[in-house]
From Swiss-Prot:
<dbReference type="InterPro" id="IPR022631">
    <property type="entry name" value="ADOMET_SYNTHASE_CS"/>
</dbReference>
<dbReference type="InterPro" id="IPR022636">
    <property type="entry name" value="S-AdoMet_synthetase_sfam"/>
</dbReference>
<dbReference type="InterPro" id="IPR022628">
    <property type="entry name" value="S-AdoMet_synt_N"/>
</dbReference>
<feature type="binding site">
    <location>
        <position position="257"/>
    </location>
    <ligand>
        <name>L-methionine</name>
    </ligand>
</feature>
<feature type="binding site">
    <location>
        <position position="284"/>
    </location>
    <ligand>
        <name>ATP</name>
    </ligand>
</feature>
<protein>
    <recommendedName>
        <fullName>S-adenosylmethionine synthase</fullName>
        <ecNumber>2.5.1.6</ecNumber>
    </recommendedName>
</protein>
<feature type="binding site" description="in other chain">
    <location>
        <position position="56"/>
    </location>
    <ligand>
        <name>L-methionine</name>
    </ligand>
</feature>
<dbReference type="Pfam" id="PF02773">
    <property type="entry name" value="S-AdoMet_synt_C"/>
</dbReference>
<feature type="region of interest" description="Flexible loop">
    <location>
        <begin position="100"/>
        <end position="110"/>
    </location>
</feature>
<feature type="binding site" description="in other chain">
    <location>
        <begin position="171"/>
        <end position="173"/>
    </location>
    <ligand>
        <name>ATP</name>
    </ligand>
</feature>
<dbReference type="GO" id="GO:0005524">
    <property type="term" value="F:ATP binding"/>
</dbReference>
<dbReference type="GO" id="GO:0006556">
    <property type="term" value="P:S-adenosylmethionine biosynthetic process"/>
</dbReference>
<dbReference type="InterPro" id="IPR002133">
    <property type="entry name" value="S-AdoMet_synthetase"/>
</dbReference>
<keyword id="KW-0547">Nucleotide-binding</keyword>
<feature type="binding site">
    <location>
        <position position="280"/>
    </location>
    <ligand>
        <name>ATP</name>
    </ligand>
</feature>
<feature type="binding site" description="in other chain">
    <location>
        <begin position="263"/>
        <end position="264"/>
    </location>
    <ligand>
        <name>ATP</name>
    </ligand>
</feature>
<dbReference type="InterPro" id="IPR022629">
    <property type="entry name" value="S-AdoMet_synt_central"/>
</dbReference>
Length: 407
């Protein structure tokens, strides 16, 4: 019997890097809502009292970026002096956006291999490799460690926003270690939560007292509710439980650490449980295959698992800039399928159109911000892009294709 512990982490919406992801995707949403053909590559930097948005944009949309950025920061919770020193009302906002390079645009506008089919005219926005993954460890077909870490992070933000734990501040991280036996999760080994908080809670200001108070509150209001519906639950007797191990966490957010778009790519995907091609998602329009093809790869992998063709599936896609058809498609089932990897790959080639134009069209990736009131990509910029049962994401809905594959 093999036995090991696997660990994944998540971060809250107030983490400096996640602020940047949300700002970049809010910019993307705003531009696509007005002009669905917008080309966007928006990067964000935050530091003490400063937010910079930069990158390349080609669009007919007109957006007040200053107001947009401040609104995102305020919604996260950085909107007063008590929010840890970073304030949407007083921070400097610098905008440095340029146009997309015409050399890149020409390959995306008219693919090198098009031959009559309109979907062949959309070339990949860059070269690269993308991975998608699914497994049967959770109802949403995600690995359990990252699923639990996201649950805790979302709940941490929820009890802050609704006032249940009003002393919490926006910055925070979660980490979950799961025990596996023969590749099946059997126990929760460790839960770690680091959360920013005010300096004094109900008269308690010493480090030991703060940790004890926060630890007890988080178990009651975060850990237990976040795991209540799971068959595998943490136990006070057997699960190691760590809260703010350094003692206190008062200075946080951009006041404590600089943040950048695209620095939480493992949090965004599978928590390290599957491979990653290296490309970030946020701030990129759908012609960037770093984003759209990663969504498609997840769709394929999830469909294979949902159809019962494998218990685990990892899909690798690769693209060349300006070329519509994938350079390669590979499926790995890790010995959990009655079919060979070659057979599964052939099945994918026969049933999925993985050209960028087809991915964009099938998932309506250019139109979703407009259809959802100007707020779509920002929703997935925190707490993961996959396995989101709280959001209606087209790449997560595999019911139709899974039924077809079963037949």
């Amino acid at each position: 019997m093999s036995r090991y512990v696997f660990t994944s982490e998540s971060v809250t919406e107030g983490h400096p890097d996640k602020i940047c992801d949300q700002v970049s995707d809010a910019v993307l949403d705003a531009l696509l809502a007005q002009d669905p053909a917008s080309r966007v590559a928006c990067e964000t930097v935050v530091n003490t009292g400063l937010c910079i948005i930069t990158g390349e944009v080609t669009t007919t949309a007109r957006v007040d970026f200053n107001t947009l950025v401040r609104g995102v920061i305020a919604d996260i919770g950085y909107s007063s002096a008590k929010a840890g020193g970073f304030d949407a009302n007083s921070c400097a906002v610098l905008v440095a956006l340029d146009q997309q390079s015409p050399d890149i645009a020409q390959g995306v506008d008219e693919a090198d291999d098009h031959a009559g089919d309109p979907l062949d005219k959309v070339g990949a926005g860059d070269q690269g490799i993308m991975f998608g993954y699914a497994c049967d460890e959770t109802p949403e077909l995600m690995p359990l460690p990252i699923s639990l870490a996201h649950r805790l992070a979302r709940r941490l933000a929820e009890v802050r926003h609704n006032g249940t734990l009003g002393y919490l501040l926006p910055d925070g991280k979660t980490q979950v270690s799961v025990v596996y036996e023969d590749d099946q999760p059997v126990a929760i080994d460790t839960i770690l939560i680091s959360t920013q908080h005010i300096a004094e809670i109900d008269g308690i200001s010493d480090e030991k007292g703060l940790r004890e108070r926060i630890s007890a509150d988080l178990w009651t209001h975060v850990v237990e509710p976040a795991t209540a519906d799971l068959s595998l639950k943490p136990s006070k007797d057997t699960t190691k439980y760590l809260v703010n191990p350094t003692g206190k966490f008062v200075v946080g957010g951009p006041q404590g650490d600089a943040g950048l778009t695209g620095r939480k790519i493992i949090v965004d995907t599978y928590g390290g449980y599957a491979r990653h091609g290296g490309g970030a998602f946020s701030g990129k329009d759908p012609t960037k295959v770093d984003r759209s093809a990663a969504y498609a790869a997840r769709f394929v992998a999830k469909a294979l698992v949902a159809a019962g063709l494998a218990r685990k599936a990892e899909v690798q896609l690769s693209y060349a800039i300006g070329v519509a058809k994938p350079v390669s498609i590979l499926v790995e089932s890790f010995g959990t399928s009655s079919h060979s990897n070659d057979e599964l790959t052939e099945l994918v080639n026969a049933n999925f159109d993985l050209r960028p134009g087809a991915i964009i069209e099938n998932f309506k990736l250019r139109n979703l911000p407009q259809q959802r009131g100007g707020n779509f990509y920002r929703e997935v910029a925190a707490y993961g892009h996959f396995g989101r049962s709280d959001l209606n994401l087209p790449w997560e809905d595999v019911s139709v294709i899974a039924a077809k594959l079963k037949g």
